[in-house]
Amino acid sequence: MHAGLRCDASTDPGLCGVVAVGDHPAAAAAWAEQLGVPVLEHRPQEGSGVILLADEPPALQLLGRRAPGPVAIDFTDHQLQRRVAGSTLRRDPLARAVGLHRRPQTAVVDATAGLGHDGWVLAALGARMTWIERSPVLAALLDAALERARANAQHADTATRVRLHPGDLCHLLPELDATSREVVYIDPMYPDGSTRGAVGRPAQVLRALHADARGPDEDQLLAAALGHATRRVVVKRPQRAAPVAGPPPSRSVAGRAVRFDVYEVNG
């Protein structure tokens, strides 16, 4: 956990508290203070929402007797590393949509960083990444995961290519230097019942975490991105979903379950 990040839990109304796991009561207290939520003695068995498990690594857990397992942000995770190992500049659809196959060190803003998986893959492929995340708890978990990755010799190089900015993209994008926002990538939070890039447990946790908090609509995200990207905007969409309302994309790059709509700014 990074002591420098102070969080406002108002945009994470679904976060109910922190529960210590094993020998981590001090970590639980520190997380609770940072996030502005209570330390809970036990995991609630009923109700709705999300708790943070103070473990190594920390993880988010849905409430409820039949809730799926916890979701952690861990850039040393074997499944994520398999995805990185299988990604190349020319084969990975996101990398091609961003344009890394032509300019591997492109400066990319992942304006909706979420769990960081897409942004990590782009960084591993050579992109200079700026991550923006409006959720205080996700931003704090991303920060802690990046700190762990920087201390790991195998992943330090990738981690050093990432800068994290907690906050709202509509406010932060204008403050970024133009050289750091050649491409702006957004992965909107899709409504319940739709298929998004992160399915299953991660999507359930993110929806429960944000609960009724209202962030920018996807067309507002697109407008903000188009207003500040210097080369292009890339939007992740379900394969059969309509494009985000607004100007039509210049083209699309298809993946297995999703597609990436590309909006050329200077093209």
Curated annotation (Swiss-Prot):
Q: Which GO terms describe its molecular function?
A: rRNA (guanine-N2-)-methyltransferase activity
EC number assigned by the record? 2.1.1.242
Q: What is its main location?
A: cytoplasm
**What reaction(s) does this enzyme catalyze?**
guanosine(1516) in 16S rRNA + S-adenosyl-L-methionine = N(2)-methylguanosine(1516) in 16S rRNA + S-adenosyl-L-homocysteine + H(+)
Q: What is this protein called?
A: Ribosomal RNA small subunit methyltransferase J
Q: Tell me which species this is from.
A: Halorhodospira halophila (strain DSM 244 / SL1)
Query: Does the keyword Transferase feature in the UniProt annotation?
Result: yes
Entry superkingdom: Bacteria
